[in-house]
């Protein structure tokens, strides 16, 4: 009887440990996003924009952009990110993704030689996790 109880307890402990591992957030999260982009008061649909978030390296990449963003803050729900090139006139990005609902946005901008920020495009997206 003691052997059966010990086996059952060991099984429960192993299951609990496996469940805890499954609940841990993935270090790298890939999203496929669709929605709209707005520039100069003109809105257009966008599809299959890839977002890759690496929590350990604290980086975010957006498909089609030449700049890498850094994770400014992250919690169980929201990830805020931003980054820009050090070369005047090059692209910058700032944004956020709700990893529970999949709602995301990001804004691209350039900064002129005068350090003035010029808005390029605003993206409103709904994202789904992909492998």
Sequence positions of predicted segments:
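Short, solvent-exposed loop/hinge segments that bridge or flank secondary-structure elements
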Residues: 27-62, 84-99
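Sec/Tat signal peptide C-region and signal peptidase I cleavage site
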Residues: 18-22
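Short, surface-exposed loop motifs enriched in S/T, G, D/E and P with embedded aromatic residues
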Residues: 66-74, 125-127
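Edge beta-strand at a domain terminus
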Residues: 110-131
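Low-complexity intrinsically disordered segments
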Residues: 58-68, 77-79, 86-112, 117
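Bacterial N-terminal signal peptides that target proteins for export
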Residues: 1-6
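A short, structured loop/turn motif at beta-sheet edges
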Residues: 24-26, 73-74, 96-102, 129-131
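Bacterial N-terminal signal peptides
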Residues: 7-15
């Amino acid at each position: 009887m003691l052997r059966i109880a010990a086996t059952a307890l060991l099984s429960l402990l192993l299951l609990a440990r496996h469940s805890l591992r499954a609940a841990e957030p993935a270090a790298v999260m890939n999203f496929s996003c669709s929605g709209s982009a707005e520039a100069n008061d003109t809105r257009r649909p966008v599809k299959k924009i890839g977002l890759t978030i690496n929590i350990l390296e604290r980086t975010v990449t957006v498909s089609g952009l030449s700049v890498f963003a850094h994770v400014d803050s992250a919690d169980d729900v929201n990830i805020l990110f931003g980054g820009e090139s050090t070369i005047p006139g090059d692209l910058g990005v700032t944004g956020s993704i709700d990893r529970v609902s999949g709602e995301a946005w990001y804004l691209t901008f350039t900064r002129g030689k005068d350090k003035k920020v010029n808005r390029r495009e605003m993206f409103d997206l709904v994202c789904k996790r992909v492998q």
